[in-house]
Amino acid sequence: MTISLGFVVAEFNRDLTYQMELLGREHAEFLGATVKETILVPGVFDMPLAIKKLCQREDIDAVVTIGSVIEGETDHDQVVMQHAARKIMDLSLEFNKPVTLGIPGPGMTRMAAHERVDYAKRAVEAAVKLVRRL
C-alpha cells in the first residue's frame, strides 16, 4: 500500500519553508509515500481550513504541516503557534486521520529556524508511521 500525503505549507518565511518542503518530499519518497497534493497558505495561522480540505479527501491518508514561526517584537509567535497546534490536533481527531506538526517555534530566532528545517522530515516520518500503525 502506497501512503498518500497532503502537504500544507506556509508561505510566510518561504525561504525556510521551501527548503522544508523539499526535504519533506524527498523523505516521503525515501519512505515509499507519495505527496498527492500541496496547498500553500499565507501563514501557519491560516492552515486549519486547508488541513480540513485535505482531511476530507478519501485519497489522502495523512496531512503534513510545514511552517516556521519566528520570534518577533511581541508575543505574536506564541499566540500563533499555540492556536495553530491546538487546531491541528483537533482536526486530526475530528477526521481520525494523522495530521503532523512540521512547524518549529515559537521563541525561535531566524538562525535557529535554519537549523530546524529537518522538522519537515520528522513530520513526514511521523505521518507515515501513524498511517502504518493505526
From Swiss-Prot:
Signal peptide: none
Catalytic residues, chain numbering: H76 (proton donor)
EC number: 2.5.1.78
Binding annotation for (2S)-2-hydroxy-3-oxobutyl phosphate: E73, T74, R116
Pathway assignment: Cofactor biosynthesis; riboflavin biosynthesis; riboflavin from 2-hydroxy-3-oxobutyl phosphate and 5-amino-6-(D-ribitylamino)uracil: step 1/2
Residue sites binding 5-amino-6-(D-ribitylamino)uracil per the record: F12, V44, F45, D46, S68, V69, I70, L101
Keywords attached to this entry: Riboflavin biosynthesis, Transferase
Biological process according to GO: riboflavin biosynthetic process
Superkingdom: Archaea
Catalysed reaction, written as an equation: (2S)-2-hydroxy-3-oxobutyl phosphate + 5-amino-6-(D-ribitylamino)uracil = 6,7-dimethyl-8-(1-D-ribityl)lumazine + phosphate + 2 H2O + H(+)
A cellular component annotation (GO) from this entry: riboflavin synthase complex
Matches recorded under InterPro entries: LS, LS/RS, LS/RS_sf
Example GO molecular function: 6,7-dimethyl-8-ribityllumazine synthase activity
Listed SUPFAM superfamilies: Lumazine synthase (SSF52121)
Protein purpose: Catalyzes the formation of 6,7-dimethyl-8-ribityllumazine by condensation of 5-amino-6-(D-ribitylamino)uracil with 3,4-dihydroxy-2-butanone 4-phosphate. This is the penultimate step in the biosynthesis of riboflavin.
Family: Belongs to the DMRL synthase family.
HAMAP family recorded: Lumazine_synth (MF_00178)
Protein name: 6,7-dimethyl-8-ribityllumazine synthase
Organism (species): Methanosarcina mazei (strain ATCC BAA-159 / DSM 3647 / Goe1 / Go1 / JCM 11833 / OCM 88) (Methanosarcina frisia)
